[in-house]
C-alpha cells in the first residue's frame, strides 16, 4: 500500500524524533512517501498531487489547521488519517484520536490502512 505522509514541520509538536517514530509505526503496514509542507496552503497541493499520483491513502501529521488544508486537496475516495501535531489539537479530542502521534499512527495503521 502506497501512503502519502504529509507533514507540517512547523507544527508545534512535530519534531524529527517524533516523525521518525511515526514513520517507523506506519512503515510496518505501508510504503511511505513523506511530503513536507513549506508554506501556507501547501498541504492541499501535496495531497492533491499524491491523490493524482495514485496514493492509496493519505496521513497528515500536523495541527488542526494543516489537516483542514489537507482535506481541501483530497480527491476521489482516497482515505485520510490524522496524526495530531498541533499545540491545542481540538479536532483529535473531539474525534477521539489519541493525543500521542505514535499512538494515533498505530490506530491509523489498524483502521485506515
Predicted regions mapped to residue ranges:
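ATP/NTP phosphate-donor binding region
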Residues: 1-58, 68, 102-105
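Glycine-rich Rossmann-fold phosphate-binding loop(s) that bind the pyrophosphate
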Residues: 62-63, 85
Amino acid at each position: 500500500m502506497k501512503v502519502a505522509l504529509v507533514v507540517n514541520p512547523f507544527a508545534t509538536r512535530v519534531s524529527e524524533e517524533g516523525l521518525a517514530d511515526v514513520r517507523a509505526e506506519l512503515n510496518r503496514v505501508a510504503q511511505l512517501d513523506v511530503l513536507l509542507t513549506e508554506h501556507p496552503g501547501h498541504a492541499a497541493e501535496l495531497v492533491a498531487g499524491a491523490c493524482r499520483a495514485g496514493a492509496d491513502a493519505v496521513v497528515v501529521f500536523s495541527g488542526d489547521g494543516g489537516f483542514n488544508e489537507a482535506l481541501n486537496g483530497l480527491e476521489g475516495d482516497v482515505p485520510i488519517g490524522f496524526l495530531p501535531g498541533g499545540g491545542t489539537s481540538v479536532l483529535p479530542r473531539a474525534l477521539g484520536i489519541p493525543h500521542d502521534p505514535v499512538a494515533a499512527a498505530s490506530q491509523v495503521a489498524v483502521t485506515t490502512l
